[in-house]
Amino acid sequence: MYKDYKESHENYLKAIYLISKKKKGGWVLNSEIAEFLKVKPSSVTEMLYKLKNEGFIIWRPRKSIHLTVKGKKVAQSILRKNKELKKFFKNILNLKDDLKLNEICCKIEHHITPEVRIALEHLNSTLV
C-alpha cells in the first residue's frame, strides 16, 4: 500500500537506514544522523519525536535509535526508487554527472508511486 509520507520523514528514515547498515546491531546515534544530514542535533531530536510517535523508530532519548519494521520498509522503498531513477537517468538519458544525479534523484524519489517504480524497473531492464 502506497502512503505519501512527508519528504523530511523519508529523508530521516533513509539516513537512519543507511547509517545502521554500517553498524553492528543497527543502532544509530542522534549525532550520526545530524552529521549525515548536515543538520543541527536539535533538529534531529525534534524529528525523532515525530518518527517515534508515528511508529517508524524505536528511540531511547540520549541513547540510540533503531528502525521499526515499518520504518525499514519506508526507507527501503525510497532507496529502491532512488536506484531505479539513477539507472534511468544514467543508462537511458545518458546523464553521467554522479553528483547531479544524486541531487536530482533525491528530490524526485519522494514523488514516485510504487506503480511508477515498477514501470521504471521494467523500462530499465528492457532497454539496458
Regions found by a protein language model. Give the residues of each.
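N-terminal helix-turn-helix DNA-binding core of bacterial DNA-binding proteins
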Residues: 3-39
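Basic amphipathic alpha-helical segments that dock to polyanions
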Residues: 33, 44-54
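A short, conserved structural fragment
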Residues: 52-62
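Basic, amphipathic "hinge/linker" alpha-helix immediately C-terminal to the N-terminal HTH DNA-binding motif
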Residues: 63-82
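Arg/Lys-rich, alpha-helical DNA-contact motif
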Residues: 79-111
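C-terminal regulatory/oligomerization modules of transcriptional regulators
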Residues: 103-128
